[in-house]
Amino acid sequence: MYDISGWKHVFKLDPNKELSEEHLEMICESGTDAVIVGGSDGVTIDNVLHMLVSIRRYAVPCVLEVSDVEAITPGFDFYYIPSVLNSRKVEWVTGVHHEALKEFGDIMDWDEIFMEGYCVLNPEAKVAQLTDAKCDVTEDDVIAYARLADKLLRLPIFYLEYSGTYGDVELVKNVKAQLKQAKLYYGGGISNAEQAKEMAQHADTVVVGNIIYDDIKAALKTVKAVKGE
């Protein structure tokens, strides 16, 4: 079993986006600590299975970030369950989770499941619109969400999601200073190695996503930038 607490760099692949077999191989053989499969829309059991089968040809750990209960399938190493703490809709905080547990609770392997406390900070992002996230928040608000995840809910992961735009480095630094046991994941807008390295100075885990589809070479350079190898 892998230890997620040591992961510094992960790639996130959207099953609803096209990725060539050649580029997938580059991603999986890049030295990244893991590959997360997940997206905000168009996620189906068919495209999730396609990604799973493709990634399983390689040794890299593989995680399904669950956004649709209908697209869950066995075979992943871990399952990340996001709870959008700044959503205005209770369904994205605990609602869909309750429904899933009602249906699948008896057969779930709890050693494979990790809850993520999300704070979505880009109002233009699909995930913000889907979850009706309250993005016009102050630094004090974000720190309060971090404390909620870390100290009250005791979640293993607090995820700052800027999705599509590069985030506030000082805010990331200040949030990290508040966390005692939760690991800080940062995702959003990383388009080059320099940005990845900058965020890695503060976040425990840097998530690289969209740049994979825009500039595969730039995406691959983020691995060494984050891990310093």
From Swiss-Prot:
Gene Ontology terms describing biological process: glycerophospholipid biosynthetic process
Annotated catalysed reactions: sn-glycerol 1-phosphate + all-trans-heptaprenyl diphosphate = 3-heptaprenyl-sn-glycero-1-phosphate + diphosphate
Superkingdom as given in the UniProt entry: Bacteria
Cofactor dependence: Mg(2+)
Pfam family, one: PcrB
Pathway connected to this protein: Membrane lipid metabolism; glycerophospholipid metabolism
Residues reported to bind Mg(2+): D14, S40
Keywords: Lipid biosynthesis, Lipid metabolism, Magnesium, Metal-binding, Phospholipid biosynthesis, Phospholipid metabolism, Transferase
EC numbers, comma separated: 2.5.1.n9
Residues reported in the UniProt entry to bind sn-glycerol 1-phosphate: K12, Y159, L160, E161, Y162, S163, G164, G189, G209, N210
Subunit text: Homodimer.
Function: Prenyltransferase that catalyzes in vivo the transfer of the heptaprenyl moiety of heptaprenyl pyrophosphate (HepPP; 35 carbon atoms) to the C3 hydroxyl of sn-glycerol-1-phosphate (G1P), producing heptaprenylglyceryl phosphate (HepGP). This reaction is an ether-bond-formation step in the biosynthesis of archaea-type G1P-based membrane lipids found in Bacillales.
Family: Belongs to the GGGP/HepGP synthase family. Group I subfamily.
Name of the molecule in the record: Heptaprenylglyceryl phosphate synthase
Organism: Bacillus cereus (strain ATCC 10987 / NRS 248)
